[in-house]
């Protein structure tokens, strides 16, 4: 195989990876994860691209101290971010599987 053929093969592979990654990003924008804090007192729904779609606060919390509400909101959002990151990693790994990329390279496309 000559150099020009290798270059063409590499370019074709790059285009395929880019198309798969774009498709995966669109898929992540449509998928949602949910997380909660305080045994469900605060719930967050977020897309796989880290866009918060819903925030639910149990009415009983509104009578408590604001510091508790703030802490629970932060905890719920952080839990949702973790879940969204896991979803993103899985989705992008599927999008780039079979491309012969070394381990850890899928993270470059997030």
Curated annotation (Swiss-Prot):
It comes from Psychrobacter sp. (strain PRwf-1). GO terms for molecular function: DNA binding. It is found in: Cytoplasm, Nucleoid. Homodimer. Keywords: Cytoplasm, DNA-binding. GO terms for cellular component: bacterial nucleoid; cytosol. Disulfide bonds: none annotated. Binds to DNA and alters its conformation. May be involved in regulation of gene expression, nucleoid organization and DNA protection. The lineage of its organism: Bacteria, Pseudomonadati, Pseudomonadota, Gammaproteobacteria, Moraxellales. Belongs to the YbaB/EbfC family. Pfam families: YbaB_DNA_bd (PF02575). This is Nucleoid-associated protein PsycPRwf_1729.
């Amino acid at each position: 195989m000559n150099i020009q053929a290798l270059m063409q093969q590499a370019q074709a592979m790059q285009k395929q990876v880019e198309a798969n990654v774009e498709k995966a990003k669109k898929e992540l924008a449509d998928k949602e994860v949910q997380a909660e804090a305080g045994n469900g007192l605060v719930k967050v729904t977020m897309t796989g691209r880290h866009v918060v779609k819903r925030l639910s606060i149990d009415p009983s919390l509104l009578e408590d101290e604001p510091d508790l509400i703030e802490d629970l909101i932060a905890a719920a959002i952080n839990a949702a971010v973790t879940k969204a990151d896991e979803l993103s990693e899985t989705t992008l790994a599927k999008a780039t599987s079979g491309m012969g990329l070394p381990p850890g390279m899928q993270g470059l496309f997030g």
